[in-house]
Curated annotation (Swiss-Prot):
Task performed by this protein: This protein is one of the early assembly proteins of the 50S ribosomal subunit, although it is not seen to bind rRNA by itself. It is important during the early stages of 50S assembly.
Molecular function terms from GO: mRNA binding; structural constituent of ribosome
Similarity annotation: Belongs to the universal ribosomal protein uL13 family.
The keyword Cell cycle belongs to this UniProt entry's keyword annotation: no
Alphabetized CDD domains for the sequence: Ribosomal_L13 (cd00392)
NCBIfam families according to UniProt: rplM_bact (TIGR01066)
Stated name of the protein: Large ribosomal subunit protein uL13
Entries under InterPro entries matching the protein: Ribosomal_uL13, Ribosomal_uL13_bac-type, Ribosomal_uL13_CS, Ribosomal_uL13_sf
Pfam families per UniProt: Ribosomal_L13 (PF00572)
Gene source species: Vibrio atlanticus (strain LGP32)
Summary of subunit composition and partner proteins: Part of the 50S ribosomal subunit.
GO cellular component: cytosolic large ribosomal subunit
HAMAP family in UniProt: Ribosomal_uL13
Amino acid sequence: MKTFVAKPETVKRDWYVVDAEGKTLGRLASEIASRLRGKHKAEYTPHVDTGDYIIVVNAEKVAVTGNKAKGKVYYRHSEFPGGLKTITFEKLIAKKPEMVLELAVKGMLPRGPLGRAMYRKLKVYAGTEHNHVAQQPQVLDI
């Protein structure tokens, strides 16, 4: 018997909606990253994108434990000398609530073209409304 290898054209992708209200950031992000990769499926193949589409609502209400609301710092650099920019979790969740979850999930996905394709299947919204009703997403309880 030969080892099964999934082909990109035969992969069936489902749409799921996840409510992030009150969920811990890291635990939620790791489960979402695993589902974007397709690791929950029997036909998972590492070099093929077998994951599902994930819609996350209420990203502004995601929780962090301990003092991370004030202490967790996000860094970025402009590539110019002295161009290091920092922002705390508290300020980032007030300014761009979607970005917190997007950065957490993106860091858990592979680097390269396959990881970027997986990341594009993640849709994050700050509030309860999303514009993917036509895809008939199923509710996923994480």
